[in-house]
C-alpha cells in the first residue's frame, strides 16, 4: 500500500510541478519583455551601438547588393 501511495504522489504531485517549472522558465522571452519596457532613447542607443559594430564592406568588393551605405 505504501508503494502505491509513493507512486501516486510522484505522478500526481511531483511530476506536474516539474513540468510547470519548465513552462515558466523561458529566459529569452523574459529578456525580450524587459527590453520592451525601455524608453525610446535607451532603445535608440542600443540600436545605434549594434549598428556601429557592423564592419563596412571593401569598396572594391561592393556591388549593387550593398545596402548599408558603406560603399
Swiss-Prot record:
Q: What is its main location?
A: secreted
> Which tissues carry this protein?
Expressed by the venom duct.
Q: Where in the cell is it found?
A: Secreted
Q: Which residues form the propeptide?
A: 25-54
A Pfam family: Conotoxin
Q: Which family does it belong to?
A: Belongs to the conotoxin M superfamily.
Recorded source organism is Conus quercinus
The signal peptide here is 1-24
Cellular component aspect of the GO annotation: extracellular region
| GO MF annotation: an example | ion channel inhibitor activity
Cysteine-cysteine disulfides: 56-66, 57-70, 62-71
Q: What is the name attached to this protein's record?
A: Conotoxin Qc3.1
Keywords for this protein: Disulfide bond, Secreted, Signal, Toxin
Source organism, top-level taxon? Eukaryota
Domain comment in the entry: The cysteine framework is III (CC-C-C-CC).
Amino acid at each position: 500500500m505504501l508503494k502505491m501511495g509513493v507512486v501516486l504522489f510522484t505522478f500526481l504531485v511531483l511530476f506536474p510541478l516539474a513540468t510547470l517549472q519548465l513552462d515558466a522558465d523561458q529566459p529569452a522571452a523574459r529578456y525580450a519583455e524587459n527590453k520592451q519596457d525601455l524608453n525610446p532613447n535607451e532603445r535608440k542607443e542600443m540600436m545605434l551601438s549594434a549598428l556601429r559594430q557592423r564592419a563596412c564592406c571593401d569598396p572594391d568588393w561592393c556591388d549593387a547588393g550593398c545596402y548599408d551605405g558603406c560603399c
